[in-house]
Amino acid sequence: MDIVGGQNLRQMWDDLAGVYGDKTALIFESCEGIVRQFSYASLNEEINRTANLFYALGIRKGDRVALHLDNCPEFIFCWFGLAKIGAIMVPINARLLGEESAWILQNSQVSLLVTSAQFYPMYREIRQDNSTPLNHICLIGEQLPADDGVSHFSQLQARQSATLCYTPALSTDDTAEILFTSGTTSRPKGVVITHYNLRFAGYYSAWQIALRDDDVYMTVMPAFHIDCQCTAAMPAFSAGSTFVLLEKYSARAFWDQVRKYQATVTECIPMMIRTLMVQPAAPTDRQHHLREVMFYLNLSAQEKDAFTERFGVRLLTSYGMTETIVGIIGDRPGDKRRWPSIGRVGFSYEAEIRDDQNRPLPAGEIGEICIKGIPGKTIFKEYYMQPEATARALEPEGWLHTGDSGYQDEDGYFYFVDRRCNMIKRGGENVSCVELENIISAHPKIQDIVVVGIKDAIRDEAIKAFIVLNEGETLSEAEFFSFCENNMAKFKVPSFMEIRTDLPRNCSGKIIKKNLK
């Protein structure tokens, strides 16, 4: 089944501009409250100007261009402008430091970068040490440094024609993007994403949330992340909806922004839900137009119930990863939710639970979640320049090993247990970090929690809890360990606890466990 119909991203935007014209496509709000708005026709023109800018700078089909930007309209211009001329976007996590960013530039052989003044000093140093092929930088901002090889993005873009001047032959199988994984446990891998992948993501995710052209989809997820691109932007544009992109998340402002833009769909991660819940309750909490809140793991039942009751919303669980492109297992708008299930497998996919010998397991037994799709179409094509890593993750028949543990029930609903690499081995027992975090997060004094395994000479690993307390609270070790002993099996009780003011996170909200020991 080919629901994309051979359409690449260039054709998509030309069609969207023709069909929806003056309808609002994109609204962007900066941290300072400055709002920029684009219709489908005007956004397509901005994309064409950006494509022509890249062509003028020597970029051709197959060339790779890096973007290191916070959320902004220019990210959207560049993403689709590169796709229109067959070039490849390499988005860089906005929180990465110099060595990490240089590693991505080197491994993807990027010669041109688009970034902002905020990140420019880091790239000036990278260029000076000649460790990467980077030789030109397009800078977004008011001031342009007097350095060779630096251009002013906005000035150059404004001079370009709104009609595309370079139209190489494109196939849906062409690479549109190399998206490096977050690398919370190891070096990131470059996930190769095709035009087909992105077109499919638009249709699939629009189906998943029953998106219509009168919907308003608001997100604060970082644009360099798969969630923003494939479960928010692509479905919003594919359905002819209005896409609202916020520069950064603010717990104090978020719910007001939901009301301001009359958002009908949004997406949240656990950190957002927890920080929204500690905001003072207001009579306007339930005054909104939201019909669905896309939600990504993990949240305890108590937290879920408290959030949905206070704000009068439904959480639509969606499970996926960069390699699956979309949430391949999830709830559906018309279905009754079966919490804590992560839902059922979506169309165009198959899912199984397998044991360590790669054999399918019956209902109720815990094993690895494996997904079957079509590489380069419904799941990622490959890891860039890493054939061995690709072979480990992706079987020739299209089965993807997710590295996640879970099980399914007799009715085909799936349940997430934990990342397999996130299991702590303690004296012969496997302990799920997620299970412990969900239990401990129910403590009324605790705002945020993560547990990790640390080396133990006797029992393989000991369990350590890192805790962030609610403002003004104190928590003794005796009180903490007593709570754990009363709520979990003895072998699961942490051996150590440490109170912190915050936890290290990447831009998608994931806790960077390798920074905690």
UniProtKB/Swiss-Prot annotation:
CDD domains: FACL_DitJ_like (cd05934). The keyword Ligase applies. It holds the Pfam family AMP-binding. GO terms for molecular function: carnitine-CoA ligase activity; crotonobetaine-CoA ligase activity; medium-chain fatty acid-CoA ligase activity. Its EC number is 6.2.1.48. PROSITE patterns: AMP_BINDING. Keywords: Ligase. NCBIfam families: PRK08008.1. This is Crotonobetaine/carnitine--CoA ligase. It comes from Salmonella schwarzengrund (strain CVM19633). The gene is caiC.
